[in-house]
Amino acid sequence: MAPSRKFFVGGNWKMNGRKKCLGELICTLNAAKLPADTEVVCAPPTAYIDFARQKLDPKIAVAAQNCYKVTNGAFTGEISPGMIKDLGATWVVLGHSERRHIFGESDELIGQKVNHALSEGLGVIACIGEKLDEREAGITEKVVFEQTKAIADNVKDWCKVVLAYEPVWAIGTGKTATPQQAQEVHEKLRGWLKCNVSEGVAQCTRIIYGGSVTGATCKELASQPDVDGFLVGGASLKPEFVDIINAKQ
């Protein structure tokens, strides 16, 4: 990892938890020794964004797990970037594979969401990744490059974008891409940014890995030169999340 890219660890709590158990998790995080050279962001369920922001140590940022592509309107069940900011969150996760595959979000819609979230001042954790059949068909690059292009076409300033590579076959399955597999895709993604955006953006943009990251797998993954952090699912709800945050130490 280049010295200019601060290590980044995001915890995606998904649709999990109630105030009691999330409060206990927050107490664990607040009491832990977290490295100053690692940026930490937690993404609670929408209903608990305000609760998390009030309880978490200020050095831990809060993200929403989704937002819509416009400011206001008749969009039942949606949340806008302005509302997210109003609750004290500063980041949003967009393009997660569960949004793509369960809720049918297209590359085009995700790009529009990224554009609007950035224009409203939120940082964006933009997710990309291939399914198992796509990896086995040898089209991983094609898939992730197309997904990245849909995002890149909507980004003017990359300073507030973190790209999260999450191989769908490794999410919640217990399977993890090997450090070498993760590094290979991250390196190719950085190469795509260099060729299609700019060398400066390629060097400065953090590309993080998501896909069954655990306390046991994080250190070797973190040692790869193009792995700039993690987007953690299930393990972010457990005390081992602290070990993952400390993976570079």
Curated annotation (Swiss-Prot):
Chain residues that bind substrate: N12, K14
Highest taxon of source: Eukaryota
Subcellular location: Cytoplasm
Modification N6-acetyllysine, positions: K14, K156, K194, K238
Active site: H96 (electrophile), E166 (proton acceptor)
Functional pathway: Carbohydrate degradation; glycolysis; D-glyceraldehyde 3-phosphate from glycerone phosphate: step 1/1; Carbohydrate biosynthesis; gluconeogenesis
Residues joined by cross-link Glycyl lysine isopeptide (Lys-Gly) (interchain with G-Cter in SUMO1): K142
Residues modified to N6-methyllysine: K194
Record CDD domains: TIM (cd00311)
UniProt cross-references to Pfam families, sorted A to Z: TIM
Alphabetic keyword roster: Acetylation, Cytoplasm, Gluconeogenesis, Glycolysis, Isomerase, Isopeptide bond, Lyase, Methylation, Nitration, Phosphoprotein, Ubl conjugation
Residues that bear Phosphothreonine: T173, T214
Catalysed reactions, as listed in the record: dihydroxyacetone phosphate = methylglyoxal + phosphate; D-glyceraldehyde 3-phosphate = dihydroxyacetone phosphate
The enzyme's E.C. designation: 5.3.1.1, 4.2.3.3
Residues carrying 3'-nitrotyrosine: Y68, Y209
Location of Phosphoserine modifications: S80, S106, S198, S212, S223
UniProt-recorded Gene Ontology molecular function terms: isomerase activity; methylglyoxal synthase activity; protein homodimerization activity; triose-phosphate isomerase activity; ubiquitin protein ligase binding
HAMAP family per the UniProt record, alphabetical: TIM_B (MF_00147_B)
Function: Triosephosphate isomerase is an extremely efficient metabolic enzyme that catalyzes the interconversion between dihydroxyacetone phosphate (DHAP) and D-glyceraldehyde-3-phosphate (G3P) in glycolysis and gluconeogenesis. It is also responsible for the non-negligible production of methylglyoxal a reactive cytotoxic side-product that modifies and can alter proteins, DNA and lipids.
Cross-referenced PANTHER family: TRIOSEPHOSPHATE ISOMERASE
Protein name (Swiss-Prot/TrEMBL): Triosephosphate isomerase
Taxonomic source organism: Rattus norvegicus (Rat)
